[in-house]
């Protein structure tokens, strides 16, 4: 009897020693869009300055600070938030789609015990980014137009009152096809953005947790999202410039010039430096936007787990 007890004590049941398997949590589809809306509200003035620099005409300020001062002086404080409704609409369509599909693909094809590799993440991010780019294109056209409108001569301004008014006006005056102007460069940019932002964030976060011994807290989220923002800005800069030029073109310019023609024209006039025109304001905007997006997203997830008792 004693020997049996001794044997039982020296060989406890395996279940007692086995670590509990990691539990997969299925988060709501809309979390990425919600987090991106919060981030857009915080960083919108930086996005507006980036667009103004990319589309500036002769005599317009050529620096970020100069553009800030110019907008504030001519349009007031709320001029820095011109086009905010379109920016929010864009996040509700574009970011909800790309984040949602990306997370669904991760949930379907991976498990907590077998995290996806970099190339798997890139493939999933590319697919979700392309679909998100198409879904968000109408709002993206509006966003770019509303941000750059005040920089145009009064006779050329479109004067959209808000995102809904802009959608109705564009459809009525330019036809439904105008909502998808620049859809190919925009979808290409969305692929690059989602790949360099979401896939790199997951990769940098795993590196921080597994290789650097960091805890899963806001410091880690900040570090991983900062690096993801740097990568995303550099990768997306050339396509971002092309997208902005195409979307701000007049209907006549849009019909008469192809993407190849636009590339040839701006390279001849500006040299290859056009590819990184506005990189600094792009990073100053995209860096904080990426950081804010992922921190808001992680907080969404944290609150969800708390409410669900997970």
Curated annotation (Swiss-Prot):
Pfam family membership, one: Mito_carr
Keywords, sorted A to Z: Membrane, Mitochondrion, Mitochondrion inner membrane, Repeat, Translocase, Transmembrane, Transmembrane helix, Transport
An annotated GO BP: transmembrane transport
InterPro entries membership: Mit_carrier, Mito_Metabolite_Transporter, Mitochondrial_sb/sol_carrier, Mt_carrier_dom_sf
Membrane topology: Multi-pass membrane protein
A GO-annotated cellular component: mitochondrial inner membrane
Principal subcellular localisation of the protein: mitochondrion
Enzyme class, broadest EC rank: translocase
Residue windows of the Solcar repeats: 23-108, 115-207, 216-303
Phenotypic effect of disruption: Leads to fluffy and albino colonies, and reduced conidia formation, when all 6 genes ctpA to ctpF are deleted.
Domain of life: Eukaryota
Coiled coil ranges: none
Membrane-spanning intervals of the chain: 29-49, 85-105, 122-142, 186-206, 222-242, 275-296
SUPFAM superfamilies, sorted: Mitochondrial carrier
Compartments it resides in: Mitochondrion inner membrane
Record-listed E.C. numbers: 7.-.-.-
Known role: Mitochondrial transporter that does not mediate citrate export from mitochondria to cytoplasm. Its exact function has still to be determined.
Family classification: Belongs to the mitochondrial carrier (TC 2.A.29) family.
Record's protein name: Mitochondrial citrate transporter F
Species this protein is from: Aspergillus niger (strain ATCC 1015 / CBS 113.46 / FGSC A1144 / LSHB Ac4 / NCTC 3858a / NRRL 328 / USDA 3528.7)
Taxonomic lineage from the root: Eukaryota, Fungi, Dikarya, Ascomycota, Pezizomycotina
Gene designation: ctpF
